[in-house]
């Protein structure tokens, strides 16, 4: 199932070497980790909602997420310090490549009116962040068993030094970009 890992080792490394003429094999950019974050604003009023988000994120990532807590109190949002407000999971190694493969091949084609990602989503240091508006694009989520549609933020952290290197790397994994 780790076709993307083999794709990276066999084809993407060679194309990166040709494009950017790296002298050392450790200079070649690679994906370090993928962080999936799900903010659950409704958890302020109902603490049971966070459990549903945890279950969804566990099914999507194949790994148990950690609950994120509020750092400080904000009265206008009725938010107190250390209140549960979301969950996140960090994927590395084989699970990371497995998730990326499912994202590109299965989930992104199921997103409504999806044209591709903007190049503006890079942060200047080679990392790429985007959001999905609904968790039901993943086949692991059963539409009948969810309580509400939730979005998520996905950050792909790379070892690339520039956005151009990172764009070339992620394009090798068939991530669709427009511009």
Curated annotation (Swiss-Prot):
Pfam families: Ribosomal_L5, Ribosomal_L5_C. InterPro entries: Ribosomal_uL5, Ribosomal_uL5_bac-type, Ribosomal_uL5_C, Ribosomal_uL5_CS, Ribosomal_uL5_dom_sf, Ribosomal_uL5_N. Keywords: Ribonucleoprotein, Ribosomal protein, RNA-binding, rRNA-binding, tRNA-binding. One of its GO terms (biological process) is translation. PROSITE patterns: RIBOSOMAL_L5. GO terms for molecular function: rRNA binding; structural constituent of ribosome; tRNA binding. One of its GO terms (cellular component) is ribosome. Belongs to the universal ribosomal protein uL5 family. This is one of the proteins that bind and probably mediate the attachment of the 5S RNA into the large ribosomal subunit, where it forms part of the central protuberance. In the 70S ribosome it contacts protein S13 of the 30S subunit (bridge B1b), connecting the 2 subunits; this bridge is implicated in subunit movement. Contacts the P site tRNA; the 5S rRNA and some of its associated proteins might help stabilize positioning of ribosome-bound tRNAs. Part of the 50S ribosomal subunit; part of the 5S rRNA/L5/L18/L25 subcomplex. Contacts the 5S rRNA and the P site tRNA. Forms a bridge to the 30S subunit in the 70S ribosome. This is Large ribosomal subunit protein uL5. It comes from Rickettsia prowazekii (strain Madrid E).
